[in-house]
């Protein structure tokens, strides 16, 4: 027996609904995390960079709500006391925090949020939002290649590069705290793998918020 076209269309619409995810990219400096993040933001309209709340004064050219959410110290303190941050920290006298409400609203409407953070920030987010978090760690093909990339920037002294290399090895030691590990020996190849991870995670059954009703509709005939 033929089904009702109107019902079929409704079920298709339901199946398209999904909950967004918090997509974390981490890597030691020079491994390509920032390049991959920029490519992802420029080529995928469903994901946006996480916007932090800060007490830092707004700089020329910055836009409130785009670069940061700028607040007074008293408001930031209130948000901390109200548990409105996934994580927060004080850096050089200014406070920075990841706001729960803004991110949860985006996830609810099916939008994804990109985080360019280190292993410590990743751990904090995962502890508070495990079901929504996808963790990807990007590795260099070798330490020699990482050193070559850092030196090739031409912006750091030998002492700074040495410090970055030491820090890189410390960060790499936390690779097993991630869901996926990708070796960046080629930017395009690495980017392709990261996009495949994102696409697969978007299709997880637990994120398909309209799937239950869709399947029930199919079973009713």
UniProtKB/Swiss-Prot annotation:
It comes from the Bacteria. GO terms for molecular function: ATP binding; guanylate kinase activity. The keyword Transferase applies. CDD domains: GMPK. GO terms for cellular component: cytosol. ATP binds at residues 27-34. InterPro entries: GK/Ca_channel_bsu, Guanylate_kin-like_dom, Guanylate_kinase, Guanylate_kinase_CS, P-loop_NTPase. Pfam families: Guanylate_kin. Keywords: ATP-binding, Cytoplasm, Kinase, Nucleotide-binding, Transferase. It is found in: Cytoplasm. Essential for recycling GMP and indirectly, cGMP. This is Guanylate kinase. It comes from Novosphingobium aromaticivorans (strain ATCC 700278 / DSM 12444 / CCUG 56034 / CIP 105152 / NBRC 16084 / F199).
């Amino acid at each position: 027996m033929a089904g009702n076209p109107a019902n079929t269309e409704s079920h298709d619409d339901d199946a398209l609904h999904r909950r967004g995810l918090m997509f974390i990219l981490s890597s030691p400096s020079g491994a390509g995390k920032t390049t991959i993040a920029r490519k992802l933001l420029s080529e995928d309209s469903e994901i946006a960079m996480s916007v932090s709340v800060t007490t830092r004064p707004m700089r020329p050219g910055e836009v409130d709500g785009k670069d940061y959410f700028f607040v007074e110290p008293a408001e930031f303190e209130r948000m901390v006391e109200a548990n409105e941050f996934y994580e927060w920290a004080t850096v050089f006298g200014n406070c920075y925090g990841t706001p729960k409400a803004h991110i949860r609203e985006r996830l609810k409407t099916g939008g994804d949020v990109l985080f360019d953070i280190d292993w410590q920030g990743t751990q904090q987010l995962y502890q508070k939002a495990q079901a929504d978090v996808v963790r990807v760690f990007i590795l260099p093909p070798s330490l020699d290649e990482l050193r070559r990339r850092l030196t090739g920037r031409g912006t750091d002294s030998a002492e700074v590069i040495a410090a970055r290399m030491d820090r890189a090895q410390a960060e790499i030691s936390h690779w097993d705290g991630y869901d996926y590990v990708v070796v960046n020996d080629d930017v395009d190849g690495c980017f392709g793998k990261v996009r495949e991870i994102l696409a697969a995670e978007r299709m997880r059954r637990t994120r398909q918020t309209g799937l239950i009703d869709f399947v029930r509709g199919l079973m009713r005939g």
